[in-house]
From Swiss-Prot:
Location in the cell: Plastid, Chloroplast
Family to which the UniProt record says this protein belongs: Belongs to the universal ribosomal protein uL16 family.
Gene Ontology cellular component terms for the protein in this record: chloroplast; mitochondrial large ribosomal subunit
Protein name (database record): Large ribosomal subunit protein uL16c
MF-aspect GO terms: rRNA binding; structural constituent of ribosome
Family annotation (CDD domains): Ribosomal_L16_L10e
GO process terms (BP): mitochondrial translation
Organism for this UniProt entry: Trieres chinensis (Marine centric diatom)
Highest taxon of source: Eukaryota
Length: 137
């Protein structure tokens, strides 16, 4: 699972996901990408499940870039614990994703294989996504 080696703070505020992505919204490294169409938190487990799906379908023949990183902690309290006594313990890590963010990029495979691999990976994610190609200049 992905998680930072160290962070400035152990626990973070939830925050809000307003507006569209202004950064990380173009295919930069690969030839094809998977773009988010909705705002959400994507957990490190979901990222890993999607990554495994892509690498298995392409038979490890594709170059893969994961464009999001889970750098925010989500805390949870123990079941049946009373209110108060501070914030809960860190439960898992999430990446904050806005609409338009590129989640994964692929290169070195034909377009139909890339499209199918990213489509299969999209089933592992909790949002609607779109397959996009790089704009060649």
């Amino acid at each position: 699972m992905l998680s930072p080696k160290r962070t400035k703070y152990r626990k973070y505020h939830r925050g809000r996901m307003r507006g569209k992505a202004t950064r990380g919204n173009e295919v930069t490294f690969g030839d094809y990408g998977l773009q988010a169409l909705e705002p959400t938190w994507i957990t490190s487990r979901q990222i890993e499940a999607a990554r495994r799906t892509i690498t298995r379908y392409t038979k490890r023949g594709a170059a893969l870039w994961i464009r999001i990183f889970p750098d925010k902690t989500v805390t949870a309290r123990a079941a049946e614990s009373r209110m108060g006594s501070g914030k809960g313990a860190v439960d898992y890590w999430v990446a904050v994703v806005k609409p338009g963010t590129i989640l994964f990029e692929i290169a070195s495979v034909p377009e139909e294989i890339a499209a199918t691999a990213l489509h299969l990976a999209s089933y592992k994610l909790p949002i609607k996504t779109k397959f996009i190609t790089r704009i060649k200049i």
